[in-house]
Amino acid sequence: MAAAIEIPTIVFPNSSAQQRMPVVGMGSAPDFTCKKDTKEAIIEAVKQGYRHFDTAAAYGSEQALGEALKEAIHLGLVSRQDLFVTSKLWVTENHPHLVLPALRKSLKTLQLEYLDLYLIHWPLSSQPGKFSFPIEVEDLLPFDVKGVWESMEECQKLGLTKAIGVSNFSVKKLQNLLSVATIRPVVDQVEMNLAWQQKKLREFCKENGIIVTAFSPLRKGASRGPNEVMENDVLKEIAEAHGKSIAQVSLRWLYEQGVTFVPKSYDKERMNQNLHIFDWALTEQDHHKISQISQSRLISGPTKPQLADLWDDQI
């Protein structure tokens, strides 16, 4: 077997412990039905060099991920210290008194003593114990961002997670959080890809020492119709000029922006291809062409119907 690729890491600017996160992670959002496939794919990913694994309570993949990582450690492929595991707090537990129990439950399911990163999945709270997806709007409750964040901070102080952050927060929602936070969020995980580049959010996060992690970096997910990234003629042209795939061009662009990313592929070849982005670069002309790509959001939100103010009109 080919040697595992060494993935670059990024230091959390707001971390006193100089904590490092691999720039590429493996996503595990639900579009699978077989737990065995998930487990096998994760073990294969470890063999290829992946060390960062992204899950969430709502994904239904924590158990399979935990079993796979336990086996990988048992096989001597990796140690727990080498791994970086992220999970997320679902909206039903997005209440101050439920954060710590939710994290403990995730740790038990993952068979881990601590997480490397724990994120608030959405800036929304809903009825405790009433899981539905999409979330019914009538189940939503006021989101106590200050109280929930204090509970997140407590999780970090207890050593149950090494770092805390958020997901799907707009600039405005980040500003609100920063105004009440004692421990600042280290990450905002959001949809980001070449057809949804989020320049304003990237600039705000850079100014405030927050790392952006891109989910749906290849614009796969809840898409209907053509994929504006993978079927883009401009990107096809750039990829051919470099002898690379469109996926590699897309991930290389994110890397050059200082963005981390968690593509999901359980295909052995694509999994490997997604790591071959560190020994070449896009040209200035490539960047100009990419900046001209038409922009639109793919994931509009987790509720039914959609909320008009979820993104605060952010482009």
Swiss-Prot record:
Binding residue positions for substrate: H121
Induction context: By pathogen infection.
Protein origin, superkingdom: Eukaryota
GO MF annotation list: 6'-deoxychalcone synthase activity; aldose reductase (NADPH) activity
Site (Lowers pKa of active site Tyr): K88
Pathway involvement of the protein, from the record: Phytoalexin biosynthesis; glyceollin biosynthesis
Active site annotation, chain numbering: Y59
Keyword Transferase: yes
EC number: 2.3.1.170
Signal peptide (residue range): none
Keywords: Flavonoid biosynthesis, NADP, Transferase
Chain positions recorded as NADP(+) binding sites: 216-274
GO annotation, cellular component aspect: cytosol
Catalytic reaction annotation: 4-coumaroyl-CoA + 3 malonyl-CoA + NADPH + 4 H(+) = isoliquiritigenin + 3 CO2 + NADP(+) + 4 CoA + H2O
Cross-referenced Pfam families: Aldo_ket_red
An annotated GO BP: flavonoid biosynthetic process
Cited function: Co-acts with chalcone synthase in formation of 4,2',4'-trihydroxychalcone, involved in the biosynthesis of glyceollin type phytoalexins.
Assembly, per entry: Monomer.
Family to which the UniProt record says this protein belongs: Belongs to the aldo/keto reductase family.
Protein name, UniProt field: NAD(P)H-dependent 6'-deoxychalcone synthase
Organism field: Glycine max
